[in-house]
UniProtKB/Swiss-Prot annotation:
GO terms for biological process: defense response to bacterium. It is found in: Secreted. Shows a medium antibacterial activity against S.aureus and L.mesenteriodes. InterPro entries: Antimicrobial_8 (IPR012527). It comes from Uperoleia inundata (Floodplain toadlet). GO terms for cellular component: extracellular region. Keywords: Amidation, Amphibian defense peptide, Antibiotic, Antimicrobial, Secreted. The modification Valine amide is found at residue 17. Expressed by the skin dorsal glands. This is Uperin-3.1.
Length: 17
C-alpha cells in the first residue's frame, strides 16, 4: 500500500544518510 511504499522509501533514505 501507500504506507508500505513510504516506509520503504524512508528506509532507503535512512540508509543513504
Amino acid at each position: 500500500g501507500v504506507l508500505d511504499a513510504f516506509r520503504k522509501i524512508a528506509t532507503v533514505v535512512k540508509n543513504v544518510v
